[in-house]
């Protein structure tokens, strides 16, 4: 559960498809790493990002080793996807983001749909992007390790917040994470 100063949202984690990302995220959450951190980047109709520690680098890993992005054709960057950000080398650490790209936004254009179809993307994936929105160009680059199932309106509200020239919210939005096992 993500208890933010803007409200609460909940996500399910995909430990089978993204075991390293889930282990890193849950261990850091259990250690209290994310508690009190702030949302560090907001791009309206794209992402809400957090997980950078006080050093501003977002390089904390529970066991000291960065991990490679975990990609699969089973998980995609649909709106509400909880993702581990990969750096230029393809490695991930503590930074995570939630996709906020909504259906009908400019990210999933008819031209992109046509390109996906021409490239042989599965019809169900293309249809899901049309229905849910998202960022298909991030598939196979960053790790999807969860999906928001409740409180997407909170994520959408955070995505509407005023930001500075670095896309950081002008008013701090703090995070407190609680892990609920079901």
Residue ranges and their predicted role:
Residues 1-180:
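Cyclophilin-like peptidyl-prolyl cis-trans isomerases
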């Amino acid at each position: 559960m993500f208890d933010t100063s803007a409200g609460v949202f909940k996500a399910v984690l995909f430990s089978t498809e993204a075991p390293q990302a889930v282990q890193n995220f849950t261990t850091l959450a259990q250690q209290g790493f994310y508690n009190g951190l702030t949302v560090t980047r907001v791009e309206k109709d794209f992402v809400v990002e957090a997980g950078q520690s006080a050093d501003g680098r977002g390089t904390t890993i529970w066991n000291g080793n960065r991990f490679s992005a975990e990609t699969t054709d089973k998980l995609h960057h649909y709106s509400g996807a909880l993702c581990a950000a990969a750096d230029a080398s393809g490695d991930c650490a503590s930074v995570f983001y939630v996709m906020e790209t909504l259906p009908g936004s400019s990210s999933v254009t008819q031209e992109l749909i046509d390109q996906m179809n021409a490239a042989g993307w599965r019809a169900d994936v293309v249809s899901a992007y049309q229905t849910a929105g998202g960022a298909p160009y991030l598939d196979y680059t960053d790790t999807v390790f969860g999906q928001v199932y409740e409180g997407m309106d909170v994520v959408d509200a955070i995505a509407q917040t005023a930001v500075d020239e670095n896309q950081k919210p002008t008013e701090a939005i703090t995070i407190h994470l609680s892990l609920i096992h079901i």
